C-alpha cells in the first residue's frame, strides 16, 4: 500500500510532497509499520533501536 500523506520531522507539517514546502527538508511517512506476530525481523529492529548487539 502506498501512503500519500507525509510529515516533515522538523516543523511537523503535513504535505503530499517528498520535500517540505515550508523548510525544504525531506518528509517521512507518519504511519507506523504494520504489526505482525509472525514477524521474522523484530529482533533486528530492536537491536537497531537500542544499539545493542543481540546474541542470536
Swiss-Prot record:
GO BP: pseudouridine synthesis; rRNA processing
GO molecular function list: snoRNA binding
Domain of life: Archaea
Keywords, sorted A to Z: Ribonucleoprotein, Ribosome biogenesis, rRNA processing
Keyword Chaperone in record: no
Family as reported in the entry's similarity comment: Belongs to the NOP10 family.
Protein name: Ribosome biogenesis protein Nop10
Organism: Saccharolobus islandicus (strain L.S.2.15 / Lassen #1)
Lineage: Archaea, Thermoproteota, Thermoprotei, Sulfolobales, Sulfolobaceae
Amino acid at each position: 500500500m502506498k501512503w500519500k500523506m507525509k510529515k516533515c520531522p522538523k516543523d511537523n507539517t503535513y504535505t503530499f510532497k517528498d520535500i517540505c514546502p515550508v523548510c525544504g527538508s525531506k518528509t517521512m511517512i507518519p504511519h507506523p509499520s504494520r504489526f505482525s506476530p509472525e514477524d521474522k525481523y523484530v529482533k533486528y529492529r530492536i537491536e537497531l533501536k537500542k544499539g545493542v548487539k543481540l546474541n542470536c
